[in-house]
Amino acid sequence: KLTSRIIALLSSKGNNSDNEYKFERLIEQRADIIKNAENKYDVFEDIIGKLKQEKNLNNLIIFVSPQQIEKVKEILANNNIIFHKLTQEEGTRKEAKYCNKSEREYIIQQFKTGNYQALIAIKCLDEGIDIPSASRGILMASSTNPREYVQRIGRIIRQDTNKQFAYLYDICVDSIDGDEECNTIEKKIRNKEQLRMKEIAENAINSVDALEHIIQFN
């Protein structure tokens, strides 16, 4: 529906600046729908189940949007995973109850020592926080902004003496088939997401398998 409205807007001959504003809003709405798609939770549960079976649930960071955090918390709780959220709400002032650390520093320390198996992160890990012990990352809310996704990936692939490999799961949403014009617009809109997926895949040890999945995604 949004794609059809985008096509109609592109075909219209109204005021250019007004159309440009409407176009940007529609693109943003579409990006939010993709970022928070319900189908992502099924894939997320499958990944958690696999990691749980392999006993590889420590050192996990899950990057989410604000709309996803409660559902992700519910899934982790149902799997008896010890986690903590890390958002911009956690304090940065040192306090005695956090062993003379800030709340944020305390949470990160608990994660590093294994007291928290997973962190649910919103934005605050995009820059400025170093957690080299993190070895697994799930991108529930992926960004097409190169700076943002490079910073998120960087949180996971940072070298550490106790880390031989880093594992990234980028959960993406496929497009829905429509008429030819809709499909053409869909493909153009998804180009940025494809670039992120390819960049991650091409730098992975399992690049052949990862790129095959991207080809199927196309």
Where are these regions (language model features)?
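Interdomain linker/hinge connecting the two RecA-like lobes of the SF2 helicase core
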Residues: K1-L60, V64-Q67, K71-N78
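Residue-level signal for alpha-helix termini/capping positions
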Residues: G49-Q53, K112-T113, T161
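Conserved helicase ATPase core of P-loop NTP-dependent helicases/translocases
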Residues: I61-F63, I69-D126
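Cofactor-binding loop segments of dinucleotide-utilizing enzymes, especially the Rossmann-like FAD-
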Residues: S65, Q88, S142, I171-V173
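Conserved strand-to-helix beginnings and helix N-cap segments that scaffold or border functional pockets
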Residues: P66, K73, I131, V150, ...
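A short beta-strand element within the Helicase C-terminal
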Residues: A118-I122, D126-S143, E148-Q151, F165-I171
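Conserved segment of the helicase C-terminal RecA-like domain
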Residues: R155-R190
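Long, largely alpha-helical accessory region at the distal end of helicase-like NTP-driven motors
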Residues: E180-N218
